[in-house]
């Protein structure tokens, strides 16, 4: 059950990567097998829309070097980049035009080529080294609804398509690159891929991109895990030859080895592939069927079984917030909200606020409009968040959302208290690009100023026409950039103390008389002796605990060995039983496939006769009804032949006797149908 999720740490390069530099470049040949699209097309204009109601601005600033804007690059900490949102010219007002977070819009694709593989048809290889997490290609095709997806899946299967190119974009929406798409459609599957799929919000539309999971060498095939969000009508053998190969790809739900929910949901929920694998194994052992919600590709039962944990790393917050900003699935949102509500670490809470946190909470208050209990928990969490400026609250309009809750008696008190708290926050003018370009050297100043990475809780504000650093939680303003030391320990650690009617500072040193000096010296020696005794006691305690743990481990190991010896014979018997069941299933599949193939041949046999025999009835009913009758007659005749002999195949040519019998059946069927139609018309 491999998962190609967006990694926080790139995978190491394998010791022996296979290169295909000697294979002929088949790109031009491959382009002739489909219609190339420059961007996705939509069968309905609302398909592919992001679930965010408004565009999310980042807080980066222009950073021009060599006439190129380097803002929002890989190392910038851009909040849009962290939450998988692309910046858009004229909408992101501070980072400037043509920043580095516009890879989909600029089509900054990696240099790739199509080549012929041994068993998998066409494949895609890298024409240069590709670094970890680098954007490779957008998966482009026709964005269709779920109803169209199901129709096309049947249609392509009937037309005998060997390869499928469906990808789930979001709940109820799919990208179909089968007949219209781009070169990314030729990226093959691997159970141990070097690339992963990630979904980004680009100018209000959800886009699907392929990114490097690790460094990919020039000539190496680019692969990702189809079992994440890709669909096909019929299960196909997998030829990736990886040690962890699952054997098949495609089919109704990507086989039982497919992931239990989309990769970005799993990442945000903190689900590891091993957890999914263990759950699937347990369900199979109980003989229970594993299924997903058809429209959302989520196994509800599995998600309900998860024990959610708080966000403990920046990457956890990034993944949770990116999904919350993209979706409006109430079930998944409730689970991700639970992770946020469990997060009490102040560092993580600052990160939540930073990544469009107030906009996200405003969205959740609306999504759970009828769930007062959830709204109450959100209000309590908002009250516990660290203090910031009021700018984010106003721009997200969450204050208006909270004001609307004053009408609910159960929430009135909490909403009122939260609004009162927010009213104490200060509002500052946002630093805009124009404020720094009034002088000839203004741009260089703002570039240096905005490159400063601020410690936790600090913001950049604009006061009296100049930039300042502000910590709302500690009510501190600074002209020079703050450091972590300033965040952790203010300059004055203790307040001034009253002395003889005035004040003195405890941090001011005063000379000691000899008696006081000796007294302090004795106190220090006593304290050091006490600390030494405590450390010795602690060492003895740790040693006893270590011995006890080792004793317990030895006992557990002996028990494990004993249990293993007892179960060895049982495992052998289970293995033999499993091999027997596998052989029986293989035989049943062979028989089922054979019967289906014979039925298809009989359908084709009768389909070349029946339409011509009933076309004379075209004067009595419309063409569509005639076609429907032809299909029904073909199915009936095929069924009759299979009942006689399920192994018999139709003859190569239609005999006169067979044609006569078919003609008699068609005439009888159509006459009865016309009689029923006439009787129905008379009764009206």
Swiss-Prot record:
Under Enzyme Commission nomenclature, its number is 2.1.1.359
- Which keywords does this Swiss-Prot/TrEMBL entry list? Chromosome, Coiled coil, Methyltransferase, Nucleus, Repressor, S-adenosyl-L-methionine, Transcription, Transcription regulation, Transferase
Give the residue ranges for region: Disordered. 479-521, 568-595
Task: Please verify whether the record's keywords include Transmembrane helix.
Answer: no
- State where it is primarily located: nucleus
Query: What are the residue boundaries of the SET domain, all occurrences included?
Result: 110-227
Q: Which SUPFAM superfamilies match?
A: SET domain (SSF82199), WW domain (SSF51045)
Q: Which GO MF terms are attached to this record? A: histone H3K36 methyltransferase activity; histone H3K36 trimethyltransferase activity; RNA binding
Q: Which InterPro entries match?
A: AWS_dom (IPR006560), Post-SET_dom (IPR003616), Set2_fungi (IPR025788), SET2_Histone-Lys_MeTrsfase (IPR050777), SET_dom (IPR001214), SET_dom_sf (IPR046341), SRI (IPR013257), SRI_sf (IPR038190)
This protein is called what?
Answer: Histone-lysine N-methyltransferase, H3 lysine-36 specific
UniProt organism field: Eremothecium gossypii (strain ATCC 10895 / CBS 109.51 / FGSC 9923 / NRRL Y-1056)
